[in-house]
Design a protein with these regions (language model features):
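Chalcogenol-based redox active-site neighborhoods
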Residues: 1-175
Length: 175
């Protein structure tokens, strides 16, 4: 089963389905900047904003990650895990965070370098076209019990997500 997104008007096939509101987040094993495995369980008891992007080295991905970081400054983020997951190596993620003005303290960058299973399970693995093998752009928000409260598969990879809906879902899940 696959979805379609587009890039500059060209249709691109994406494997699977993004987790829908009301469903449980799929488990994952990803890699942090220190090359340590991280699982969904490492973020238990926190609300989660999972932002999946093609590459942190693109302007839209970089700018939108910074925007989420800024928006989280307005939230009580001690109980929030903001995970940004590009299809990049941990070294690129660390370099991007280090070069940012404030170091992006609200974001935990994770990499799929050891497996693309995360991208399949979260319905974002691009199957066709020149970007095959990396991820589409998506946002998934879940509560402390890993129940999805909001998800968006951005229909055009070159566009930004709906920040306001994601943040509203994140803050509403605290109540």
């Amino acid at each position: 089963m696959s979805n379609e997104v587009s890039l500059h008007g060209e249709k691109i096939s994406v494997a699977g389905k993004i987790p829908a509101p009301g469903s449980q987040l799929p488990e994952f094993k990803l890699v942090n900047k220190d090359l340590e495995d991280m699982t969904l369980g490492d973020f238990n008891h926190k609300r989660k904003l999972i932002y999946i992007v093609p590459s942190i080295d693109t302007p839209v991905c970089a700018d939108s990650s910074k925007k989420f970081n800024e928006m989280l400054n307005q939230c009580s983020h001690s109980e929030i895990a903001c995970l940004v997951i590009p299809a990049d190596l941990p070294f690129a993620n660390a370099r991007f965070a280090e070069k940012s003005e404030d170091g992006l303290p609200n974001i935990c960058f994770l990499s799929m370098m050891r497996s693309r299973q995360f991208a399949k399970d979260y319905g974002v693995l691009i199957e066709s076209g020149p970007l095959a093998g990396i991820t589409s752009r998506a946002v998934v928000v879940a509560d402390e019990k890993n129940q999805v409260v909001h998800s968006e598969l951005v229909k055009d990879i070159g566009l930004e997500p709906d920040y306001q809906k994601a943040i509203e879902a994140l803050t509403a899940s605290a109540q």
